């Protein structure tokens, strides 16, 4: 099929706005799959994706479409994740397309992550087709959403297509708009090969299978190729396209979206966003879009049963074959045994990895409190990267600490501006500006407002998103983007049990929250640690300064039970002997901290 009859497009949307359902309708209405072959969320092949209703990895499928004027077109649809953690996956998918369908929920309107993805599409010069979905729902407010689209994105009513992806309403008109408005791929088949990798997965028989878009030249089975960013070389074992299963083809031409089987042993050798070219006589200039995805959130993962460490290690190795953005290295803790310090793109990424480890590999896990990567400069001038609180130098050895900051966009009804501003202020946010989303965007909750802040990444890591939803009754949405490192005033708080620090309870906090967090930690531990035969002292400390304390009183054995009446000095002697014994026990005794205590402390944010 000619290059002029090819259309490459993606679907971008906020999470749960109906992106995967629309992909299903496009597949069904173009006859790519028969009705009996269809299942809900065809593009979401991972069980976890279907269950949570989210897209985690980018997918691609080739559709054949016969337009109303009887011309046949090849439509390459690339599905993208909608969650902020996977924004890098969205960016490289967008780089592989000429057009984007922007899906907006008729009941919710424009959300923060919708805007982030739109700006990305504009940056890559994509033709955007705005679509209002879920028009069949009773809560649909089409005039309001249309007003938002016009005021925020600048599209007239005529350019917006109204659909119900669930019922298929308006989808035929959308297909016509795709062939009419999305430009054909440019590229030159005579130039040296350049193809952009937008995803990959590991196949036990074919090695790494790279999903790519051919920008110039073509790919044939048996070609010797090279990755321009990493320098990795491989031979094409198989090339083909997705329908949605892999279908082998003789070659991939300029503008095509398909796959190549590389025979490589790990997705780390075939990074997403890299440019593929020929080993001999290849291109000189790579395509845009490659920068390695960087882990932003770190947490320790340990098996509940220490015997399961080897199973956990094997599971981590298998998961990392398909997820180049997951980093891990072994670490050990006196309380939790052997485990791994892992790096993730964000909290959802962490959540998904833990759920996959537990579900697919049948492991029971303990996950430590998530933190960020800090840059610490010692007084000696040495610069350290600290991802584990226990790696933090002593306070007098630290010259400065830098932490990652993010630019945050919150969209909320104006009714909740005050509560949102209070929440952000409590979490060390710095206000930048406010924008109103158009005069027509009115409802009983007031006009919708876009608030811009800079915030430390650690502030939004734990319960910030839940608190935002709770304080705005679920109406607010959030998007954030890494903007760099800034000087931070942070300290490590330790928990001491009978003067011995327990490493698993250490965390890095702002000093002004030390008393509040310290009190909460020792109070929770006091509830969870069983009483011993001697007094147990729990302390929270920053360096040598104690900021909170609680005591667990000793169990007392009745040593004078057998003394009936008689001389009081005999009783005193027995009680003094008991007191001496307890003093000695406290010096040499080891308090067993149960894992339940650790888990309950973890839930304290």
From Swiss-Prot:
Keywords: Cell membrane, GTP-binding, Hydrolase, Membrane, Nucleotide-binding, Protein biosynthesis
EC number: 3.6.5.n1
GO molecular function, one term: translation elongation factor activity
Keyword Glycoprotein (UniProt): no
tr-type G domain ranges (all copies): 4-186
PROSITE patterns cross-referenced by the UniProt entry: G_TR_1, G_TR_2
Localization in the cell: Cell membrane
Membrane topology: Peripheral membrane protein
Domain of life per record: Bacteria
Pfam families cross-referenced by the UniProt entry: EFG_C (PF00679), GTP_EFTU (PF00009), LepA_C (PF06421)
Binding annotation for GTP: 16-21, 133-136
Main localization (coarse): membrane
Gene Ontology biological process terms, A to Z: positive regulation of translation
InterPro entries hit by this protein: EF-4, EFG_III/V, EFG_V-like, G_TR_CS, LepA_C_sf, LepA_CTD, LepA_IV, P-loop_NTPase
Keyword GTP-binding: yes
Example of a GO cellular component annotation carried by this entry: plasma membrane
Catalysed reaction equations from the record: GTP + H2O = GDP + phosphate + H(+)
PANTHER family: TRANSLATION FACTOR GUF1 HOMOLOG, CHLOROPLASTIC, TRANSLATION FACTOR GUF1-RELATED
Known function: Required for accurate and efficient protein synthesis under certain stress conditions. May act as a fidelity factor of the translation reaction, by catalyzing a one-codon backward translocation of tRNAs on improperly translocated ribosomes. Back-translocation proceeds from a post-translocation (POST) complex to a pre-translocation (PRE) complex, thus giving elongation factor G a second chance to translocate the tRNAs correctly. Binds to ribosomes in a GTP-dependent manner.
Family stated for the protein in its record: Belongs to the TRAFAC class translation factor GTPase superfamily. Classic translation factor GTPase family. LepA subfamily.
Protein name listed in UniProt: Elongation factor 4
Source organism: Dehalococcoides mccartyi (strain ATCC BAA-2266 / KCTC 15142 / 195) (Dehalococcoides ethenogenes (strain 195))
């Amino acid at each position: 099929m000619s290059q002029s009859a090819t259309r490459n497009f993606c679907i971008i949307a906020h999470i749960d706005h109906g992106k995967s359902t629309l992909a299903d309708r496009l597949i069904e209405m173009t006859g790519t799959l028969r009705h009996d072959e269809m299942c809900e969320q065809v593009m979401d092949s991972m069980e976890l994706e279907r269950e949570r209703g989210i897209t985690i990895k980018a997918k691609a499928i080739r559709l054949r479409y016969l337009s109303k004027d009887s011309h046949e077109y090849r439509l390459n649809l690339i599905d993208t994740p909608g969650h902020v953690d996977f924004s890098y996956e969205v960016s490289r998918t967008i780089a592989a397309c000429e057009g984007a369908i922007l899906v907006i929920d008729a009941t919710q309107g424009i959300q923060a992550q919708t805007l982030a993805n739109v700006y990305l599409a504009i940056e890559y010069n994509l033709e955007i087709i705005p679509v209002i979905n879920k028009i069949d729902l009773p809560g649909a407010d089409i005039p309001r959403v249309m007003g938002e689209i016009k005021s925020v994105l600048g599209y007239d009513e005529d350019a917006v297509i109204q659909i119900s992806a669930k019922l298929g309403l308006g989808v035929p008109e959308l297909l016509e708009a795709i062939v009419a408005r999305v430009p054909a791929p440019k590229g030159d088949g005579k130039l040296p090969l350049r193809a952009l990798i937008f995803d990959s997965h590991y196949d036990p028989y074919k090695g790494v299978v790279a999903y790519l878009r051919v920008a110039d030249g073509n790919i044939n089975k048996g070609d010797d190729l090279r990755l321009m960013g990493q320098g990795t070389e491989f031979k094409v074992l198989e090339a083909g396209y997705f329908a949605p299963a892999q279908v082998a083809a003789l070659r991939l031409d300029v503008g095509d979206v398909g796959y190549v089987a590389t025979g490589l042993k790990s997705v780390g050798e075939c990074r997403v966003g890299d440019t593929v070219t020929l080993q001999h006589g290849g291109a000189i200039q790579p395509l845009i879009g490659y920068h390695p995805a960087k882990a932003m959130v770190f947490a320790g993962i340990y098996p509940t049963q220490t015997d399961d460490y080897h199973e956990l290690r094997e599971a981590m190795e298998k998961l990392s074959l398909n997820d180049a953005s997951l980093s891990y290295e072994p670490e050990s803790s006196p309380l939790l045994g052997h485990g791994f310090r892992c790096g993730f793109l964000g909290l959802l990424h962490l959540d998904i990895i833990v759920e996959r480890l537990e579900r697919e590999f049948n492991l029971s896990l303990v996950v430590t409190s998530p933190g960020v990567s800090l840059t610490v400069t010692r007084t000696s001038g040495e610069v350290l990267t600290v991802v584990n609180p226990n790696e933090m130098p002593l306070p007098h050895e630290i010259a400065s600490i830098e932490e990652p900051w993010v630019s945050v966009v919150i969209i909320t009804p104006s009714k909740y501006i005050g509560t949102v501003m209070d929440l952000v202020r409590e979490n060390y946010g710095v206000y930048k500006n406010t924008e109103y989303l158009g005069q027509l965007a009115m409802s009983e909750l007031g006009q919708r407002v876009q608030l811009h802040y800079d915030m430390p990444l650690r502030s939004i890591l734990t319960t910030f998103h839940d608190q935002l939803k709770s304080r705005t009754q679920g109406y607010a949405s959030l998007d954030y983007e890494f903007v760099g490192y800034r000087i931070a005033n942070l300290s490590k708080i330790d928990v001491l049990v009978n003067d011995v620090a327990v490493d698993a309870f250490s965390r890095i906090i702002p000093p002004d929250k030390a008393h509040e967090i310290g009190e909460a930690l020792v109070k929770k531990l006091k509830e969870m640690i069983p009483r011993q035969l001697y007094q147990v002292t729990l302390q929270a400390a920053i360096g040598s300064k104690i900021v909170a304390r609680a005591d667990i009183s000793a169990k007392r054995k009745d040593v004078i039970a057998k003394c009936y009446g008689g001389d009081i000095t005999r009783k005193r002697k027995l009680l003094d002997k008991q007191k001496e014994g307890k003093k000695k026990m406290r010096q040499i005794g080891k308090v067993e901290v149960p894992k339940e205590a650790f888990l309950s402390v973890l839930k304290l944010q």
